[in-house]
Amino acid sequence: MISIEQEGLELLQFESTFLDNDVFSFVTTRNQAKIDNPYSSFNLGLYSGGDRDEVLRNLEQLSKVIGISSENIFLPHQAHGVKIGTVDEDFMSLDTDSKAKALNGIDALITNIPFVVIGV
């Protein structure tokens, strides 16, 4: 595992994912979270009970570090089931509210759109 720290943000990469130059994969951490407040560090979960404004700031910070607009970062509202969502041209043409609705209850995402971040 490789740790990359940039602008106070730590990203972890797995060497096995370097095989495809068209895909950049990473994991964010919340290593600085306080024991009594799991949302005190780098929380990206809009649906986890953390402060929404803080999450939006964190998404902007991530956006700057990876060089992709925060509008192209998609994280579903997981239901811990088996539904897989697709971020394709049809999805990208939706307005913001429709995208949020489409991501509700989704447990995994796939895409073929360049410069889009998908995660869980």
Indicate residue ranges for each PLM-predicted region.
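Active-site microenvironment for binding and transforming phosphate-containing groups
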Residues: M1-V120
